[in-house]
């Protein structure tokens, strides 16, 4: 939890932090959020509705500062299952990410405290529609974003670039979905809007 940006440098430079593969912070104030987005050498900015007492306020510029530095925004869906107040706050911050940053670099995680709070990937992808994500953005937030944040953590620790190259037409049939995911991600990065699709359940 990060409420005061003053002492963040000591936190980031501590021995325990340097040993960590992934570094995530949870800003509980707007000042802490803006500092993390612009200055902190981290991988993830997460959100905790019960610890964050104020509505976080930031602009497209602040969001872009974070994403340009490879930082991802985590949405832990399990908070939505606990009570209506938490559900409202998670939806609110998710739609703010979409309004300000077009949901770029969003990663959906469980944040579960018990096995009962876990949901299968298909349910979580459908939940992404409620969070303001398109169908493709929801899929990306579940798989490609996780891989990207792991690669960012490697480059942050080593100072080196990591890349994987593969010819998509030579992928095995069970891996062909990766080619479509990459194409969808490239279109989103290029700024091409993807129409939202709502899956309707029939009784």
Could you tell me what each predicted segment is?
Residues 14-18, 31-203:
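Charged catalytic cores and adjacent phosphate/nucleic-acid-binding surfaces used
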Residues 1-33:
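A metal-dependent hydrolase metal-coordination microenvironment
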């Amino acid at each position: 939890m990060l409420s005061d940006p003053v002492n963040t440098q000591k936190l980031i430079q501590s021995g325990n932090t340097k040993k960590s593969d992934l570094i995530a912070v949870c800003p509980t104030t707007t000042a802490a959020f803006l500092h993390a987005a612009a200055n902190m050498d981290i991988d993830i900015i997460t959100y905790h509705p019960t610890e964050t007492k104020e509505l976080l306020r930031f602009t497209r510029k602040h969001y872009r500062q974070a994403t340009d530095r490879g930082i991802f925004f985590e949405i832990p869906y399990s908070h939505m299952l606990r009570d209506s107040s938490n559900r409202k706050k998670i939806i609110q911050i998710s739609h703010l990410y979409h309004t300000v940053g077009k949901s770029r670099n969003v990663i959906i995680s469980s944040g579960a405290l018990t096995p009962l709070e876990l949901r299968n990937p298909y349910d979580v992808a459908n939940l992404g529609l409620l969070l303001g994500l398109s169908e493709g953005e929801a899929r990306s937030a579940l798989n490609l974003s996780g891989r990207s944040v792991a690669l960012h953590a490697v480059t942050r620790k080593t100072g080196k670039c990591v890349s994987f190259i593969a010819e998509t037409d030579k992928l095995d049939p069970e891996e062909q979905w990766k080619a479509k995911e990459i194409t969808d991600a490239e279109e989103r990065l290029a700024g091409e809007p993807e129409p939202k699709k709502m899956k309707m359940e029939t009784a």
